[in-house]
């Protein structure tokens, strides 16, 4: 993804603004704009603010249950966003246009059933998000979910939720996360 460190900041709604994402990207990780509490115009403004503050890679997290998700799906293409993560839904209808635009697509998954459904669409990897992550409804912990997802795919698997120390990071890597 072109970052200095193998870290992706969570796409936290109402917290991860363009400024926040730019600061994370400037520090060497992949900053994400959390579009969950935004409309399409607000997302566009945040993308432009982020671009003004960094020349480093950044992305956008789109919560697919947001009524503005169809418009946001177009905004990320129009604004040249390079990475999109998705949550709260299945991005099937958006993946072809995103891939055509050269966007890397990483859906958040809380169960292996979603991996089976999304892998054939040509996504670039999966974010295996366990119960330790805020606001999500999966039934598995991150450390239980990551090896299950990795066993189903050769695509990159990113561990999310409850990783707050070097030991936890090392455990995620040992279980197959990248």
Predicted regions and their residues:
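Catalytic alpha/beta core domains of metabolic enzymes, predominantly
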Residues: 141-178
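Active-site entrance/lid segments in N-terminal catalytic domains of soluble metabolic enzymes
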Residues: 1-156
